[in-house]
A protein has these predicted regions:
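A cross-family detector of function-defining hotspots
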Residues: 2-4, 130, 156-250, 254-322, ...
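Membrane-embedded alpha-helical segments of integral membrane proteins
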Residues: 4-6, 12-16, 53-102
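N-terminal signal-anchor/start-transfer transmembrane helix
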Residues: 13-30
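Structural signal for the C-terminal ends of transmembrane alpha-helices
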Residues: 25-32, 97-104
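Membrane-interfacial, low-structure loops and terminal tails that flank and connect transmembrane helices
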Residues: 31-52
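Internal/C-terminal transmembrane anchor helices
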Residues: 104-130
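Alpha-helical transmembrane signal-anchor/signal-peptide segments
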Residues: 132-145
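Solvent-exposed, conformationally flexible loop/turn segments
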Residues: 146-149, 265-267
Length: 338
């Protein structure tokens, strides 16, 4: 329903602007002045009609860039007054470019069409946006991309998938030894139920674990399809979780974790994380706190339409007092119309 509303709104907006442009074109064609249509009538006093030279183009572009920078800084201050001031800063540069040569009603129509296309682009970005680039989780040399990497890809890369056999949980050391989990044979005997769901269980209680060379790395969740069950091999990875035990075991066996090239097994100081993730970082630990529960990073990769049209991704990294990772989660929300 959400998709239908947004797409319908954009279609109505596009039709309105198309009619507006067509109406203005017909007005310029039918309205006459001194025997000529406004479409062909000059609208300024300039008589030069040749194309702009390279030097002139550079001059006007420089003016536009300078005016645009000042206008952008003014807009960032917020407020209606600053919005009007930004337009007043930018308008003279635009008018200088417009009046550099003889212009007719045709030029005004071209400007209107350009503005309409720009306005539609702004509306598209505000309502739908563009798909975010999925973060890449790297374990040693193997890369995992949520909603793209399949269970079969993991197994081909040397990972083992374990399926939970009961309801109880086990200590980390016994997860693969006490029968709580059984190694998946890759025989298409396990299917992922239709629909999207993330797992909220702690690692020892998760439905699926994944391991490398007998070392449990964490829990993992899969998504097959919205309307049918899918065999595990063909299902996509949508969630990966590490806990303190699995992180320590990975370090002991020289297994590295990276998220978009950031080494997660190193000290994760705020400047380092900010430099690596920039706009994707939405929460950082407060400074000078002794409460270890507040030491965590929140990351997101999303568009303006949430997950209506594009997949979106989230990560939570918990730390100890030394800013070393103690818990990690990377999850995706698959694009769907709820």
């Amino acid at each position: 329903m959400g998709r239908t509303v947004i797409i319908g709104t954009l279609i109505v907006f596009a039709i309105f602007n198309l009619l507006l442009g067509l109406g203005f074109y017909l007005f310029l064609k039918k309205r006459r002045e001194n025997g000529r249509s406004l479409y062909e009538t000059p609208v300024n006093q300039q008589t030069r009609t040749e194309k702009l030279g390279l030097g002139e183009i550079l001059i006007y572009l420089t003016l536009l860039v300078i005016a645009g920078m000042f206008a952008f800084q003014t807009l960032n201050r917020g407020g209606v007054g600053n919005s009007i001031l930004a337009k007043m800063i930018l308008l003279p540069a635009l008018m200088a470019l417009f009046n550099a040569r003889k212009r007719t009603g045709k030029s005004i129509l071209a400007l209107l069409i350009t503005f309409i296309v720009f306005l539609f682009g702004v509306m598209f970005n505000l309502t739908i946006g563009f798909p975010p680039q999925a973060p890449i989780l790297q374990i040693n040399e193997s890369k995992i991309t949520l909603t793209e990497t399949k269970a079969s890809d993991l197994m081909e890369a040397g990972f083992d998938i374990y399926v939970k056999q009961g309801d109880g949980g086990s200590d980390y050391e016994d997860l693969l030894a006490d029968g709580s989990f059984q190694k998946y044979a890759g025989d298409k005997s396990v299917t992922i139920e239709k629909g999207f769901r993330l797992d909220s269980n702690a690692v020892p209680y998760a439905p699926y674990l994944f391991a490398k060379d007998g070392i449990v790395l964490g829990s993992i969740s899969f998504y097959g399809a919205e309307d049918k069950d899918v065999v595990l091999e063909d299902s996509m990875v949508i969630q990966v979780r590490f806990n303190k035990d699995s992180i320590e075991a990975a370090k002991e066996h020289a297994i590295t974790f990276k998220l978009d090239e950031l080494d997660l097994t190193s000290r994760l100081d705020v400047p380092l994380v900010q430099e690596n993730f920039k706009k994707h970082l939405w929460s950082i630990p407060p400074s000078n706190t002794s409460d270890v529960t507040q030491l965590w990073y929140g990351l997101k990769w999303k568009s303006n339409s949430d997950h209506l049209f594009w997949n979106e991704y989230y990560s939570l990294i918990r730390l100890d007092e030394n800013y070393l990772m103690t818990d990690f989660e990377l999850a995706a929300k698959v694009a769907r119309d709820e």
